[in-house]
Structures are given as C-alpha cells and as structure tokens.
Amino acid sequence: MSVVSLLGVNVINNPAKFTDKYEFEITFECLEPLQKDLEWKLTYVGSAQSDNYDQELDSLLVGPIPVGINKFVFEADPPDTKRIPIDELLGVTVILLTCAYDGREFVRVGYYVNNEYESDELRDEPPAKPDVEKIRRNVLANKPRVTRFAIKWLLPAPNSHPSSPRLTSSLTRTSTAPKSLPKRRRPRQSRAHGEESADKDAQMEGVEGPDGEGENVAEDDELSDDGSVDIEGESEDELLEEYEVVDQEGGEAAEGDEMEVDKPEPTVHKQEAMVH
C-alpha cells in the first residue's frame, strides 16, 4: 500500500507561451506520518532520440507532511532552448512530473506537450531560426500517463554499531542527495470536513474513469533491489509514438491513454490545503 497517493494535478497556465513558467496545482493524500519531505521534480524531454537532452526544470521539497489531503502549487522555469536540438524545438514532446520519498521515486506523471507557432503564417512557413517568443506550448492536461512504483516507505533502522555510523551516513548522502538543494515548501490543509467512500477510485483531475477494474499496484515480492517497480514499463519514446495531433489546439492522445492513480485505502476526512 502506498503511504502517499496522488489525487489530482491541475495545469494552471495552459496553453501558454513557450517562455512562460510551468504551474501545477498538486493534490495528494498522506495516510501515515512521514519523517522526511517529498521531493517533486519536473523534467523536459528535449529529444526522443537521446536522454542527454533531458532538462530538470525545477525541484521542490514539500514538508513536513501532515496526515490527510494536502495541496500546493509547483512552479518551474521553461526549458533552455540552447539545450534542445533545433529540429526538435517544434512539435510534440513530453514533460515528466515525478515525486520521490527519501530518494525513491514512487509516482511519475507524463504529459504530451505540443509546441507550435501562434500564427498560421509561421506554422506554414517557419523561419530557419526558430523564434521562441512566438512559439506556444499546449500541455495535453486531460490525458496524463501515470506510472506508479512500489517502494519501501519504512526502511529498517540504520546500523547502530559504533564503528559504522560515519560510513553509513556518508554512503546515504552520496547516493540520494541532489546536485543542488531544491527549494522547500510546507503544504497546507483545509479545515472543511467531509467523507468519501473508501472503495471509490481516486482519479486524476481531468481524466475520465477507465472501464477496466482493479489497480496497477505492485506486490512487495516484485520489488527490485532499490525497492522500486515500473508498473507500466513505458519509455519516453513510446509516449511520443502514441500521441496524435488532430488540430491546432494541441491534438489528442490515442485511445486508452487515461490511467487511474492510487486508490485511498481508509475513509478519511477531506481537507483543503493552502501553501505557506
């Protein structure tokens, strides 16, 4: 069972200029007290041919996390166009919103993004050198691809032998610390009370409920050595291949793109969250 369940992601500024910040209103539920913060990241896939062009746009530490339903706004800078191949600046790509606990990623949300010129003239005859100021991005917000990973939320206590604490601490910092310290934010909760049925699926906002039954939750015996399992096993290339542009408003994804997210186990009181 996942201690943290992603309930909804709302893309606030969409469509927007290519140079505008990304803004996401994220709602999640925490079932048990957490000792550490949640780390959220947004990654821009600059090329379908190589992950060398992936850009981490921003990361944010959210905590301490109270038990209940929490909400906050995640902002991230636009990608650096100098790090994107010139022939892949326009067209369809992917952004990945991920969340990790103690260095272990447990949920990933992929969105298709269509980058195109705002005017028909530029779309018909694009300049040899792309004019970034005139490019519009459109995130296909109602068709997220959600991948969940089963992780070990409560790891055994570290070795308390007097000869090993320094070594253990050093290895932990080396393997989990980000290159630069992300920003930190405290989520806020609502004071409103209400109950939901415990057997009702929690869906991503803007996604219709699937016809199939059951959940894509990995069993503990499927855990890999690092404690994670890729439930869907889909690559970024596969995400791109399934996208079909049908009009100038950003297109639509292939059938079956909508994915359900974690189902809350117990009955809880719903709380509105605010951001400090």
Swiss-Prot record:
Q: Which Gene3D superfamilies match?
A: Histone chaperone ASF1-like (2.60.40.1490)
From start to end residue, where is composition biased (Basic residues)? 181-191
- GO annotations of cellular component type: chromosome, telomeric region; cytosol; H3 histone acetyltransferase complex; nucleus
User: What GO terms in the biological process aspect are recorded for it?
Assistant: cellular response to stress; DNA replication-dependent chromatin assembly; nucleosome assembly; nucleosome disassembly; positive regulation of transcription elongation by RNA polymerase II; protein modification process; silent mating-type cassette heterochromatin formation; subtelomeric heterochromatin formation
> Basic and acidic residues: which segments have biased composition?
192-203, 261-276
Region feature (Disordered): 159-276
**Record key words, sorted:** Chaperone, Chromatin regulator, Nucleus, Transcription, Transcription regulation
> Which residue ranges have biased composition labelled Acidic residues?
208-260
A Pfam family (short name) is: ASF1_hist_chap
- InterPro entries under this entry? ASF1-like (IPR006818), ASF1-like_sf (IPR036747), Hist_deposition_Asf1 (IPR017282)
Q: Can you tell me which family this protein belongs to?
A: Belongs to the ASF1 family.
- Role played: Histone chaperone that facilitates histone deposition and histone exchange and removal during nucleosome assembly and disassembly.
Kindly state the subunit structure of this protein. Interacts with histone H3 and histone H4.
Q: What is this protein called?
A: Histone chaperone ASF1
Species of the source: Chaetomium globosum (strain ATCC 6205 / CBS 148.51 / DSM 1962 / NBRC 6347 / NRRL 1970)
